[in-house]
Amino acid sequence: MVQLRRTITTNKVFQAITSTNDKVAHFVVFMWESWLFVKMFAEDIVTFRKLQANKYVLGVLICSLCASVTSEFAQSVVSRGQRVFDVKDIICNFWGSLLGVGIAFYQDR
């Protein structure tokens, strides 16, 4: 696993792709991830133990807010400091995620 992580973060082709299209990649990946997250629930209301929540609200809370910010901190650890925290990445993550949840909502209606 460590070798795989080292290969991904030091691969020159991977670095060239992500450096030129970094913000687009963040936007598209979070849009896709959020869409998948919402679509994995068959019902609009998700029940966990005694708690109930709307799957679209969960998508916004978990994907748009939590994952958007957490991923920026995690990438610094995963890349062993080669990638740094960037507020613009969080903004792209957030808006991509919102669009993904919005597309899922539109498709379900």
Swiss-Prot record:
GO terms for cellular component: endoplasmic reticulum; membrane. It comes from the Eukaryota. Its main location: membrane. This is Uncharacterized protein YJR112W-A. It is found in: Membrane. InterPro entries: VanZ-like. It is a single-pass membrane protein. Keywords: Membrane, Transmembrane, Transmembrane helix. It comes from Saccharomyces cerevisiae (strain ATCC 204508 / S288c) (Baker's yeast). The chain crosses the membrane at residues 90-107.
